[in-house]
């Protein structure tokens, strides 16, 4: 497989791809964008959710994210065009969790389709080869979804950047015209390049593709997972330029509807976190619908309630929907949040092919923004309250 030099990442000819696959080359350019959400394009913004959602789960936060997005669908806040699920990385036991998407469609009364991602990073020329078409189908499906959308759509990335990066390389003109913004939940928010050299998990999945996201011809809302990626003596920590927060699950799960509690119980039941309490038959049974509509497993939920849940991506979903969170955890339209828990600040940022970022504040930037916590002490409680509000909206 040929690895393109970073400088050539977005310079590959699009014309050849258009001729092979009938991809139209749009002549429209990206409009100047201030630090406003993708919802500026329509009263009901469109969203594509790209996630590493697996069963058995890698980390249950992805299932909380999925429920958050579908809560916005149920409340008619967004038009969710598709859920794109990463190809499982090498050594991972799970498969793309289409069962979880089916459950959320059932709960929200929606019919959102699923796209599965590419098993390896390809350059556009390789993606054009007939033998690789199936492997690159996720990127092509993403392009077709953008193309068919009646308005520009935002893309949230909470896992690997591979498929979005490839799609952007295949048709940058389409991204300029139809991508309202990318919400990139990955990386370290430190401006210190030496500290950023320890790669955060999502970056490590595909550093070259992560770097390419910073070059896309559309607005970028960068939500680093941590200010400094954990490792060695560095622990998980709430910080100004990191989205990380956590909560005790018993503070949230009992407040949810029975079906939503069953949705979470089903993923716990089939994941590592509750494996010791499950028979192999129970852990593998694909009875997603009957389980969803069945009685609660009180003992399972009580066990899981005693565990903490790490979270990262909530702020980006809300911002894409035109919503914000106040310092006390209230969810409201962005313009009405007087004391926000976080903001997106304009920056100048670059990222090398090794996945290491450098950035600095830039008040003149109109299309690159970084997440910033306004009050580190109050942020975890505010985000937990906001997440709870969203999840409680689901029936």
Q: Which residue stretches match the model-derived regions?
A:
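Structural signal for hydrophobic packing residues in well-ordered secondary-structure cores
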Residues: 73, 105-109, 146, 217, ...
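Active-site histidine-anchored catalytic micro-motif
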Residues: 41-82, 87-96, 124-236
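N-terminal export signals
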Residues: 2-3, 8-31
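Conformational coupling and interaction surfaces
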Residues: 44, 66-79, 201-204, 220-395
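Metal-dependent C-N hydrolase catalytic cores
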Residues: 88-148, 366, 373-378, 382, ...
């Amino acid at each position: 497989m040929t690895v393109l030099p970073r400088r050539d990442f977005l310079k590959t000819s699009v014309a050849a791809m258009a001729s092979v696959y009938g991809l139209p080359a749009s002549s429209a350019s990206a409009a100047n964008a201030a630090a406003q959400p993708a919802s500026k394009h329509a009263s009901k913004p469109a969203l594509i959710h790209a996630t590493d959602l697996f069963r058995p789960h890698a980390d249950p936060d992805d299932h909380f994210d999925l429920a958050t997005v579908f809560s916005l669908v149920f409340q008619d806040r967004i038009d969710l065009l598709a859920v794109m699920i990463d190809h499982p990385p090498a050594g991972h036991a799970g498969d793309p969790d289409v069962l979880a998407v089916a459950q959320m469609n059932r709960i929200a009364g929606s019919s959102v389709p699923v796209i599965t991602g590419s098993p390896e990073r390809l350059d556009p020329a390789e993606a054009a080869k007939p033998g690789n078409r199936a492997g690159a189908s996720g990127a092509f499906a993403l392009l077709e979804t953008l193309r068919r959308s009646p308005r520009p759509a935002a893309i949230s990335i909470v896992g690997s950047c591979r498929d979005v990066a490839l799609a952007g390389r295949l048709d940058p003109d389409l991204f300029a015209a139809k991508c309202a913004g990318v919400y990139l939940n990955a990386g370290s928010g430190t401006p210190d390049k030496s500290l950023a050299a320890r790669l955060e998990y999502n970056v490590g999945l595909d550093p070259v593709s992560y770097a390419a996201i910073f070059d896309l011809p559309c607005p970028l809302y960068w939500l680093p997972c941590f200010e400094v990626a954990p490792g060695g003596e560095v622990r998980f920590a709430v910080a100004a330029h990191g989205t990380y927060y956590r909560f005790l699950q018993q503070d949230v799960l009992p407040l949810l509807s029975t079906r939503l509690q069953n949705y979470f119980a089903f993923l716990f039941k089939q994941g590592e976190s509750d494996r010791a309490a499950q028979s192999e038959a129970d852990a593998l049974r694909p009875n997603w619908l009957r389980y969803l509509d069945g009685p609660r497993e009180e003992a399972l939920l009580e066990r899981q309630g005693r565990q903490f849940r790490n979270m990262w991506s909530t702020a980006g979903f809300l911002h894409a929907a035109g919503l914000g969170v106040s310092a006390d955890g209230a969810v409201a339209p962005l313009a009405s949040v007087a004391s926000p828990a976080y903001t997106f600040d304009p920056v100048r940022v670059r990222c090398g092919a090794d996945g290491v970022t450098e950035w600095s504040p830039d008040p003149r930037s109109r299309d690159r923004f970084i997440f910033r916590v306004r009050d580190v002490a109050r942020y975890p409680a505010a985000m937990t309250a906001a997440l709870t509000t969203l999840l409680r909206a689901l029936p």
